[in-house]
Regions:
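Peripheral (often C-terminal) accessory segments that flank ATP-dependent C-N-forming ligase machineries
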Residues: 133-228
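ATP-dependent carboxylate/phosphate-activation module, predominantly the ATP-grasp catalytic core
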Residues: 16-22, 26-85, 96, 108-135, ...
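N-terminal beta-alpha lobe that positions the nucleotide/phosphoryl donor
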Residues: 1-13
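Short catalytic-loop micro-motif centered on adjacent basic/acidic residues
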Residues: 13-15, 91
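Conserved protein kinase catalytic/activation segment
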Residues: 100-103
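Active-site-adjacent "lid" and substrate-binding segments of diverse enzymatic cores
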Residues: 86-92
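Short secondary-structure junctions
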Residues: 5-7, 83-85, 179-187
Length: 228
């Protein structure tokens, strides 16, 4: 055993790290019933030995969809039974391991940022259309979910996140070259050459890329091009 840090503080806060598979789940509550829009794999990468891994890829649909969908939906159904929510957005971030079941990280009445594009790419399910229908034509929401099957994606998709150290951007050629890959649906490069990376600024990442493929296996191959 090796000591990583020392402190002379009288109290310390210890947080357990969950090493289970992580998921992002987006749903819509209609008449007190949870309707699943999507469940994605939320993947992380250890960039420095001994440090907590950072979020680098969310994949739609999850490869564990059939294992987690029913139990995760039941969790949200029980949740709104207590809160009284009858309609609107409801999302959950959770962990799952075969021997431990589901462990909830967060439940919130919102959709996940930078992910509504993926429901459209993968399923043809438009979050924008859902919200507009909620405001103006609620009857159409029922039709949207009647036609939506989370087990029948038309594509496989992912958003790739790139984070960086607080240094000056010297060269963005590689970032723009990656944006030209055929699998890229939408690139989002936040910094220009010469700009300084700010920890708490207007830019959440160095760059992100929405990519798609016909199969999960092909999506894995395309992803490796970005992280070589």
């Amino acid at each position: 055993m090796q000591t990583a840090e020392y402190t002379n503080c009288q109290e310390i806060l210890i947080e357990e790290y969950n090493d289970g598979f992580e998921f992002n789940m987006m749903t819509w509550v209609m008449d007190g019933e949870v309707n699943v829009i999507s469940i994605a794999d939320r993947e992380k990468t250890e960039v420095e030995e001994g440090m907590l891994p950072i979020s680098t890829r969310n994949v739609y649909p999850s490869r564990f969809l059939s294992e987690v969908e029913k139990n995760a939906t039941d969790v949200l159904q029980r949740y709104i039974r207590h809160t009284g929510q009858m309609e609107g957005a409801l999302s959950m971030q959770f962990f799952w391991k075969p021997d431990k079941g589901i462990q909830v990280c967060e439940i919130a009445g919102r959709f996940f940022g930078y992910e509504h594009e993926l429901t459209d790419m993968v399923y043809g399910f438009s979050i924008e259309e859902l919200l507009l229908n909620y405001l103006y034509e609620k009857d159409k929401i029922q039709t949207m979910f009647a036609q939506h099957d989370i087990y029948a994606p038309s594509k496989y998709g992912a958003v790739l996140y790139f984070q960086g150290r607080q240094l000056q951007i010297a060269d963005q050629k590689a970032a723009y070259q990656l944006a030209q890959e055929r699998c890229v649906v939408k690139p989002w490069i936040f910094y220009k050459e010469g700009e300084n990376v700010i920890e708490y600024g207007p830019n959440p990442y160095l760059a992100l890329y929405y990519i798609e493929a016909d199969t999960r296996g092909q999506l894995e191959k395309e992803t490796r091009k970005f992280f070589q």
